[in-house]
Amino acid sequence: MRILGIDPGLARVGYGVIDTSGGQQRMLDCGIIRTEPGYSEGDRMVVIASDLRQLIRAWRPELAAVEKFFFYRSSTTISVVQARGVVMMTLARFKVPVVEFPPMQIKLALAGFGHAEKDEVLEAVMRELNLTDPPRPDDAADALAVALTGWFQR
């Protein structure tokens, strides 16, 4: 199964693509969709949708795993939620089934406990995908963790 993991954001949307055929998980691709801070929010949403469409067309995921937004007080909360909405809409347009996970569930699935530190989750991602070097940037590594959670929780 090919799974696209998404770590939503406005400035950077992390993505990770894994393949689970043959009983092993392997990373196919990871990176970020970057938007320019000088652009309007609307233009940034267009960039996210456009780049995500390209990823979906290139990798043809059978499942998307998206991190659920964890609400807290921040000046960027609304923008991040809107960017996540663009991600969800784009996935729906391509009829990609979606599963969603809050950060605590991702940490639990990867590191064994919901309050794991970021480096513990990263180590688990590297172990599960048999990587010698950590995926970069952090948003891409987070997206791979989301994709793996999608596989483990199916």
Swiss-Prot record:
It catalyses: Endonucleolytic cleavage at a junction such as a reciprocal single-stranded crossover between two homologous DNA duplexes (Holliday junction). One of its GO terms (cellular component) is Holliday junction resolvase complex. Signal peptide: none annotated. Binds 2 Mg(2+) ion per subunit. Its cofactor is Mg(2+). One of its GO terms (molecular function) is crossover junction DNA endonuclease activity. Its EC number is 3.1.21.10. It comes from the Bacteria. The keyword Membrane does not apply. It holds the Pfam family RuvC. Keywords: Cytoplasm, DNA damage, DNA recombination, DNA repair, DNA-binding, Endonuclease, Hydrolase, Magnesium, Metal-binding, Nuclease. The keyword Disulfide bond does not apply. Mg(2+) 2 binds at residue 67. One of its GO terms (biological process) is DNA repair. The RuvA-RuvB-RuvC complex processes Holliday junction (HJ) DNA during genetic recombination and DNA repair. Endonuclease that resolves HJ intermediates. Cleaves cruciform DNA by making single-stranded nicks across the HJ at symmetrical positions within the homologous arms, yielding a 5'-phosphate and a 3'-hydroxyl group; requires a central core of homology in the junction. The consensus cleavage sequence is 5'-(A/T)TT(C/G)-3'. Cleavage occurs on the 3'-side of the TT dinucleotide at the point of strand exchange. Belongs to the RuvC family. NCBIfam families: PRK00039.2-1 (NF000711). This is Crossover junction endodeoxyribonuclease RuvC. It comes from Synechococcus sp. (strain CC9902).
